[in-house]
Amino acid sequence: MSLPDGFYIRRMEEGDLEQVTETLKVLTTVGTITPESFSKLIKYWNEATVWNDNEDKKIMQYNPMVIVDKRTETVAATGNIIIERKIIHELGLCGHIEDIAVNSKYQGQGLGKLLIDQLVTIGFDYGCYKIILDCDEKNVKFYEKCGFSNAGVEMQIRK
């Protein structure tokens, strides 16, 4: 499945702050983020790598992606896959999909599934043995359509 006409996908950039935070508000509270802090975050994400046996292939630890409307240069969707090097599975890689959000103006166009597909491709291309995510009960059917299956229970503790 490819992106609909008029959209493209790319890595998140420093100039995306306002649109990304606005898009993430459909998911949860975002709070106040200064342009300076966002710039530092993007720089960190662009430099952080995961140790790799195959030095020919750089494994980016953070892979924040956005789907953009070409007509307006508006961020329509955002998400991230974070790559973790584990001890188990012979020092295997595990991908964690995080912060999937589609701008309310663009929902219902299949962009969320396309974004998930792209993030899964990134994870498997890096060699992840599995890709996991946490979601609200109301989103289970969506993630099942994306090929995910229930594999346990999420637990949390908050301060």
UniProtKB/Swiss-Prot annotation:
Residue numbers bearing the N-acetylserine modification: 2
Enzyme class per UniProt: transferase
Ligand binding (acetyl-CoA): 100-102, 108-113, 143-145
Gene Ontology molecular function: glucosamine 6-phosphate N-acetyltransferase activity
Pathway where this protein functions: Nucleotide-sugar biosynthesis; UDP-N-acetyl-alpha-D-glucosamine biosynthesis; N-acetyl-alpha-D-glucosamine 1-phosphate from alpha-D-glucosamine 6-phosphate (route I): step 1/2
EC number: 2.3.1.4
SUPFAM superfamilies (alphabetical): Acyl-CoA N-acyltransferases (Nat)
GO CC terms, sorted: cytoplasm; nucleus
Methyltransferase is among the record's keywords: no
Binding site residues for D-glucosamine 6-phosphate: 28, 86-89, 98-100, 129-130, 134, 158
Quaternary structure and interacting proteins, as annotated: Homodimer.
Other notes: Present with 2550 molecules/cell in log phase SD medium.
Protein name: Glucosamine 6-phosphate N-acetyltransferase
